[in-house]
Amino acid sequence: MGKMKDKDVDAEKYEKAQRSPKLCGTNYPVSIAFIVVNEFCERFSYYGMKAVLTLYFMNYLHWDKNLSTAIYHAFSGLCYFTPLLGALIADSWLGKFKTIIYLSIVYVIGHVVKSVGAIPDVGDSTVHIALSMVGLGLIALGTGGIKPCVAAFGGDQFDEDNIDERRKFFSIFYMSINAGSVLSTIITPILRGDVQCFGGDCYALAFGVPAALMVIALVVFISGSGLYKKSPPEGNVLVRVCKCIGFAISNRWTNSKKSPKRSHWLDWAEEKYSKRLIQEIKMVCRVLVLYIPLPMFWALFDQQGSRWTLQATRMNMDFGGGFIIKPDQMQMLNALLILVFIPIFDMGIYPLVGLCRIKLTPLKKMATGMILAALAFCAATAVEVYVIKTVVEPPPAKESLVQVYNLMDSDVTVQFPAHNVFSEPLKPYEEPSGYSSLPLTGESQLQNVVVSHNGMNYQCRLTFTERMAYSLLLHPTAQHNGSVCNLVKDHITKSETGAAYIRFINTHTENINVTVGTEEVHASANYGISRNISVPRGEYNKAVCVTDTKEYEINLGLLDFGAFYTVILSEAGNNLAVKKMEDIQANNIHIGWQIPQYVFLTAGEVMFSITGLEFSYSQAPASMKSVLQAGWLMTVAFGNVIVLIVAEGAGMEQWVEFLLFAALLVAVSIIFSIMAYFYTYVDPDQLDKLFKEDGDGGKVESSKKDELSLGDMPKQTKM
């Protein structure tokens, strides 16, 4: 009686849902508007936070590029492992609606914790790291947990006779994802770089706005609560699949010697599970085997937000007319291009290839997508080869780098013991030709450097440390009767935001305070040298210099992306003479050269990712599609694990690493093509013709019970 009552209640709720209002006189239920807005805000929240994450690790937490890349991909991988947990909770316990709400709350808490961790005044660096990691963990649980629920929940809102509307809904849903991605990757880098807070880039705001968007997403979703169809949990098919496989393995292990041999190892589950379920799992396993090479594609694809962003920081970002793009904004190209490429491929390229009588099967498209992604990394390699020409690499063990500034009134000669580093005389106030390598006998070495000037030799005892860069300043004594050696440690690592570095040498007899933009530095009198300051790229025509008695206005000109400048300030009558020298070359490779690699990678994504999902769904029974979705998400997760391992373990130059990934993907695409050649397409819908459902839950009819196998399924061509 109780069960009958429950059924009546469920039926009543269902009828009520059926009568829910439609959107603007269409067959679309009003409820999907809340779901689409929720998805837009959630994707804005996720991609906005992720866009600035690598630079946050490097500039705020002060991690090196390899650790930053590793943690970035560890987080990305975790975001694709947690959907399994979300699907399990939704299907077995809470249902999709409650799962989305509860995990969205976890998501919001993660964003808030992450934003608080980006406030400099909250604790020390250990607290910032702890809050950041806790926040990212909660975000990964939230975004991954709701990932398998939201789209499926949206599909549940449609009646069975509104198939076209449901299909169009998924297109709208996908558009909302890309719209959120594009806008967030434009806006959050602006919040990071153009808004200053706590004396630097405003990461707290860049993370806080995505947090606010996630709060809006949650509020919008809850607001539509009374309009949704809410299906109760039906049990997780992935759990049943795992139990069936586990039973087959254990039963085979226990009884293989006692019982007759069976045609397939899964047939050992027949004692407990239906023939139909076993047959469906066999079909799924055939597809999952093809998934084995796929993580390598995602290993390349997900480096847009890590290695490619770091490459962009070392490039010229000026498009002219005052339009300067930020390195973390380049990721928006992927979302923009995919919106352009999908119709181009569907309505242009694929039909044209068909006219050439070339049959593009899904597996051929996926293999082609892999090759395109490999070409993207070949393009990235070519760009990197030119980019590194503007970079001064830190010296290896038992080596230092040194450059010399001759601030004397005539030529000088510098001699290092046993090393002919500077063979030619150095002219006064001449710009150094660059850093020279100085071999050392150990981790550090005291060297007697001989400086020759006007026929006199002066000996300087200087200590050099391995892996460090130095500037040796040679200037006259206060009485101008000799030479003084001043060895200064140099900062040679380029800014990860593309900013310029500048320092000042004061040859004036008075102390000087210099203001460049919002930065102020002090240079002591008589050849004092200021600290390095970082300033945004731009024209600085009115820098202010204040001495003990006067105030001067100097023209520093353009301080370009990634350059290191040394400016010598000298007294010249009633003015200050300015000599600007470029210690490290500006970023002269334009960021536009990254566009080809984004084009190749996005084209590869269209052919690989979209086609891969289409292929997977076409080759599995309806009841097993969630299992394949879980398997697909796992390939993304393992792809990020590959990058994590390479970033932390390989220790190779960046262009070599790019080339390695390209070569690995080419090799994997060949393996995948061979596997695809031997794969035979089947029609899962034919299962309904081979099986007759009865009260037992899918037993095969007796005439086919013994001989049914995948061989009975209708086949199509290979590859």
Swiss-Prot record:
Catalytic activity: a dipeptide(out) + 2 H(+)(out) = a dipeptide(in) + 2 H(+)(in); N-acetyl-D-muramoyl-L-alanyl-D-isoglutamine(out) + 3 H(+)(out) = N-acetyl-D-muramoyl-L-alanyl-D-isoglutamine(in) + 3 H(+)(in); glycyl-L-leucine(out) + 2 H(+)(out) = glycyl-L-leucine(in) + 2 H(+)(in); glycyl-L-lysine(out) + 2 H(+)(out) = glycyl-L-lysine(in) + 2 H(+)(in)
InterPro entries associated with the record: MFS_trans_sf, POT_fam, PTR2_symporter_CS
Transmembrane segments: 44-61, 70-90, 100-120, 126-146, 170-190, 202-222, 281-301, 335-355, 368-388, 595-615, 627-647, 658-678
Residues bearing attached sugar chains per UniProt: 66, 481, 513, 532
Source species, domain of life: Eukaryota
Keyword Lipid biosynthesis recorded: no
One of the Pfam families matching this protein, by short name: PTR2
Keywords: Cell membrane, Cytoplasmic vesicle, Glycoprotein, Immunity, Innate immunity, Membrane, Peptide transport, Protein transport, Symport, Transmembrane, Transmembrane helix, Transport
GO cellular component assignments: apical plasma membrane; phagocytic vesicle membrane; plasma membrane
SUPFAM superfamilies: MFS general substrate transporter
GO biological process, one term: regulation of nucleotide-binding domain, leucine rich repeat containing receptor signaling pathway
PANTHER family named in the record: OLIGOPEPTIDE TRANSPORTER-RELATED
Similarity field: Belongs to the major facilitator superfamily. Proton-dependent oligopeptide transporter (POT/PTR) (TC 2.A.17) family.
Function description: Proton-coupled amino-acid transporter that transports oligopeptides of 2 to 4 amino acids with a preference for dipeptides. Transports neutral and anionic dipeptides with a proton to peptide stoichiometry of 2:1 or 3:1.
Name this polypeptide is given: Solute carrier family 15 member 2
Protein source organism: Danio rerio
